């Protein structure tokens, strides 16, 4: 394997041996594709011999760089399969932790345990020896905390539920140790975070690893600290991928005051919009459904106000909406504003359960369905159990595509793997293999489109990337079998496996 640490000063490069061949110029743009690529190569240029299939650079329209960074600092619980395994990981971490140190982890999923029952604070009290513990669930919508963590946050029997969240309680009313939605606000100030230099180092490592799985572009949903670190990497010419940033809704006022608009930045780092939560998640049983279940995190008056403010600021809006009730409310609110300004392209993030009657509203609202195919594999049994027959409307990529709804695919990493090849397989072949509503699957061309041109369109970049055509940025994901052999951005190799110049 070879990696390139700096990404400027592109050399005209001819990528051959793959299908199709591609020639890039000194500016990182495509000059020619296919049989004409070699004939068009003149003057000084480099030749790189590849094998396999050259795709437009694959993108991820929904990822969390900040959470991927923090995952490297705490307990990674994604592979734990039971309450016992989680507690053993906490117990092991506590052996080397100071008495007052926080133990933080991410990734537990009680729905996948042999006995799928929610845990409580007393388990953590024993495993951590009284230390404060905070363990975010796989979907990041619930948190499992110890008694000392509750005490430090000032959460008691008398503490009311947040307006957009739930504090689970024991029979006598004391907090059980499970909090759903809105937990970040309650604990954010006390959780340890890395210093600026350490954060940038970890962020650079995360981004490098994303290039290794074939990603050329990612859209991240992150706090302002991540944008600061990304700017620093960009200034040092250490940002190999294209990164599109969507800021949290509580940063909208600051963005307005600074005059940050959709498209602020350049081809490698730009701001697209604001991310806000309509509801919770399936895993935490907080997805807002048309039957009245779940949690509505933003009421209609606040939603309409948010839309107006985003329109005024010329910042796009990415609305997290998983349940069919949340999706319905979002689309109804967005519908009157279609075409309000040229780059107004609101997005419904996740869109996991769409009532068929709301599919035409996507078109009337000009909304993009930003979806993550791997969620379907993880959530299949849970969707059948919680949603019943309504699961026939879940992860309905094929139905949305047939109706003409723009699709942009991603992973929601670290909730799911960021590997786009796994996502492609989930979107195309998995449903037929397991017999789960196979009519909702996609053809390979449509799925590839959602990972390439769809990702570009969801950030207003469809005239510059997402296709292998002259004048477009030379972003390639080269695949042989089920393996990525090379990732190219701006005509420059950022990852290669066993490559040799011709």
Show which residues each predicted segment covers.
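Distinct, well-ordered alpha-helical segments
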Residues: 228-234, 255-260, 327-339, 361
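Structural alpha-helical segments in enzyme catalytic/regulatory domains
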Residues: 262-264, 340, 364-366
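Divalent metal-binding segments
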Residues: 3-256, 276-309, 313-326, 345, ...
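Active-site microenvironment of metallo-dependent hydrolases
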Residues: 1-39, 87, 91-96, 200-212, ...
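His/Asp/Glu-enriched, well-ordered alpha-helical/loop segment
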Residues: 309-318, 325-346, 350-351, 356-360, ...
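An anion/phosphate-binding loop that grips the pyrophosphate of nucleotide cofactors and donors
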Residues: 61, 365, 474
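Structured core elements
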Residues: 104, 134, 217-219, 244, ...
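Non-cysteine beta-strand/loop elements that form the S-adenosyl-L-methionine
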Residues: 64, 268-286, 367-376
């Amino acid at each position: 394997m070879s990696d390139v640490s700096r990404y400027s000063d592109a050399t005209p490069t001819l990528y051959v041996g793959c299908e199709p061949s591609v020639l890039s110029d000194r500016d990182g743009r495509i000059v020619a594709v296919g049989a004409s690529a070699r004939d068009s190569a003149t003057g000084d240029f480099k030749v790189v011999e590849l094998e396999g299939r050259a795709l437009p650079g694959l993108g991820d329209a929904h990822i969390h760089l900040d959470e991927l960074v923090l995952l490297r600092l705490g307990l990674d619980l994604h592979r734990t399969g039971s309450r016992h395994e989680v507690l053993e990981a906490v117990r092991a971490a506590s052996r080397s932790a100071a008495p007052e140190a926080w133990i933080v982890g991410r990734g537990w999923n009680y729905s996948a345990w042999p006995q799928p029952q929610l845990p409580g604070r007393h388990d953590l009290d024993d495993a951590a020896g009284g230390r404060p513990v905070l363990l975010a669930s796989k979907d990041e919508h619930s948190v499992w905390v110890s008694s000392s963590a509750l005490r430090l946050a000032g959460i008691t029997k008398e503490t009311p539920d947040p307006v957009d969240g739930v504090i689970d309680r024991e029979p006598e009313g004391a907090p059980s140790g499970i909090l759903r939605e809105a937990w970040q606000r309650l604990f954010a100030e006390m959780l340890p975070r890395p210093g600026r230099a350490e954060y940038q180092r970890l962020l650079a490592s995360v981004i490098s690893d994303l290039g290794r799985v074939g990603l050329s572009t990612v859209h991240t949903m992150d706090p302002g600290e991540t944008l600061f670190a990304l700017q620093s990497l960009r200034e040092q010419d250490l940002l190999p991928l294209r990164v599109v940033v969507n800021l949290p809704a509580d940063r909208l006022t600051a963005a307005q005051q600074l005059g940050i608009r959709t498209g602020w930045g350049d081809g490698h780092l730009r701001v697209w919009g604001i991310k806000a939560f309509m509801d919770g998640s399936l895993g935490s049983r907080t997805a807002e459904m048309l039957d009245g279940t779940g949690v509505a995190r933003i009421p209609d008056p606040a939603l309409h106000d948010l839309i107006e403010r985003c329109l005024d600021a010329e910042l796009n809006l990415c609305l997290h909406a998983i349940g069919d009730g949340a999706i319905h409310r979002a689309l109804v609110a967005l519908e009157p504003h279609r075409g309000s300004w040229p780059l107004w392209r609101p997005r419904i993030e996740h869109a996991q359960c769409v009532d068929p009657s709301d599919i035409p509203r996507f078109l009337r609202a000009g909304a993009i369905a930003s979806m993550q195919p791997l969620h379907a594999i993880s959530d299949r049994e849970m969707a059948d159990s919680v949603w019943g027959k309504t699961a026939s409307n879940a992860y309905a990529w094929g139905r949305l595509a047939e109706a003409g709804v723009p699709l942009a695919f991603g992973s929601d990493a670290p909730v799911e793997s960021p590997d786009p090849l796994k996502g492609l397989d989930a979107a195309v072949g998995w449903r037929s293999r397991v017999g789960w509503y196979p009519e909702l699957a996609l053809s390979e061309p449509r799925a590839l489109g959602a990972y390439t041109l769809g990702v570009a369109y969801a950030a207003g970049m469809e005239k510059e990337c997402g296709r292998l055509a002259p004048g477009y940025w030379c972003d390639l994901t080269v695949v042989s079998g089920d393996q990525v052999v090379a990732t190219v951005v701006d005509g420059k190799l950022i990852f290669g496996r066993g490559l040799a110049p011709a």
